[in-house]
Regions:
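Domain-level signal for soluble alpha/beta catalytic cores
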Residues: 1-147
Length: 147
């Protein structure tokens, strides 16, 4: 159905899919890896990129990324937007390189696992903590991919 809806997109329109497991007031609604939907979603959906949650164990491992077709990018949501504590940069970099076993590094990106305020209530982070998360993402991305 999604492919039918976006079939006539303009050439310069970039379409992405975000797989969200819930992001209400620093809580989540569902869990489970991407394996059950990987072949259909990553192999057949006609989008340009996927924004995927990988901020904790409830997202499963990176193996389903092997199903991502060669014309798509994957944005790894490795930095949580649910908790204020900053992740260890070395741990995040190691996870990026682990994901690169399935999707080439040049087709990977880094982001928070979701937005900071998917609903009016937002998550339990101050504005300062949110900016610190964004700075962390930027710093790690510069180390891994350069400019």
């Amino acid at each position: 159905m999604i492919n039918a809806v976006i079939a006539d997109q303009p050439d310069d329109l970039v379409i992405n899919t975000h797989i969200c497991r819930g992001n209400f007031h620093s809580t989540w609604l569902s869990s489970g890896g991407y394996a059950p939907v990987a072949a259909k979603l990553f192999g057949e959906e006609n989008v340009d990129a996927y924004y995927l949650e990988f901020d904790d164990d409830r997202s499963g491992d990176f193996a389903p990324l092997a199903e991502v077709s060669d014309d798509k990018q994957v944005v790894l949501g490795l930095v949580t937007s649910k908790r204020p504590e900053l992740e260890n940069p070395e741990t995040i970099k190691a996870r990026i390189y682990e994901a690169a076993q399935y999707v080439p590094l040049e087709r990977l990106c880094l982001s928070t696992q979701c937005g900071f305020a998917s609903t009016e209530e937002g998550n339990k982070l101050t504005e300062e903590q949110q900016w610190a998360k964004i700075a962390l993402v930027r710093s790690i991305a510069e180390e891994v991919w350069g400019e």
